[in-house]
Design a protein with these regions (language model features):
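Conserved active-site motif detector
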Residues: 1-212
Length: 212
């Protein structure tokens, strides 16, 4: 069994319902996902499942098969949301995304949890650390008990006509949402106050422009 395998991988959404969940507050950049390996109509399909037990997207069959093999070998699978994108063709367009995928030997659970948490924080800031590592990089993780981070980063995809990256980092509101998830009531109230203030300013702006 390998000690560690990491990569960035794109995924698709089934419908606009899943896409709506993906761009909402239940799925923030840097969030962690479990991976559920299934066989549907004889085809391998690995699903991304968020902390609220919602399926938000799936990988293409070839990569899904690779993940199912790793899982059958006993490796732990974890994914971290890297970005969300929208492509307007073919009409009516569709949402898709990218995640950092980690597979590791459960014997290194604590070390890898620490490493993945650090990578998640960096991704939340809009920085994508390189996770596809050679032997030396893997040894750095283990020797540091997970505190080591690669200095190299992976760039976002080049701009393409008809495609836009709609989520690449955590906004101020996203960070407040995350604190409220942790039970910080003050941040929960502050996040609502912030959203209401944005709405209020928008209304005042429209009034000043004579729109109503």
């Amino acid at each position: 069994m390998e000690r560690y395998i990491g990569t960035y991988q794109t995924f698709q959404t089934v419908s606009r319902k899943e896409a709506a969940n993906l761009i909402g507050a239940d799925n923030l950049i840097g969030d962690r996902y479990s991976i559920e390996c299934t066989i549907e109509d004889g085809v391998q399909k690995a699903w991304l499942v968020n902390r609220f037990d919602q399926r938000v997207g799936y990988f293409e069959p070839k990569y899904s098969r690779e993940l199912s093999i790793l899982k059958a070998q006993g490796m732990t699978l974890v994914a971290v949301l890297s970005f969300v994108a929208f492509t307007d063709h073919p009409e009516p367009g569709y949402y898709w995304g990218d995640v950092a995928v980690f597979a590791f030997d459960p014997a290194y659970q604590t070390t890898m949890e620490t490493f993945i948490t650090s990578v998640s924080k960096e991704i939340g800031k809009g920085r994508r650390p390189r996770v596809q590592l050679e032997t030396r990089g893997i040894e750095n993780i283990i020797e540091s008990n997970g505190t080591w981070l690669p200095s190299e980063t992976v760039p976002y995809p080049a701009k393409e006509k008809g495609t836009a990256l709609v989520k690449t980092h955590r906004s101020i509101t996203d960070r407040l949402v995350e604190e409220s998830r942790k039970g910080n009531k003050g941040c929960y109230l502050l996040s609502w106050a912030f959203l209401l203030s944005v709405v209020a300013f928008a209304i005042l702006g429209m009034k000043s422009c004579g729109l109503f």
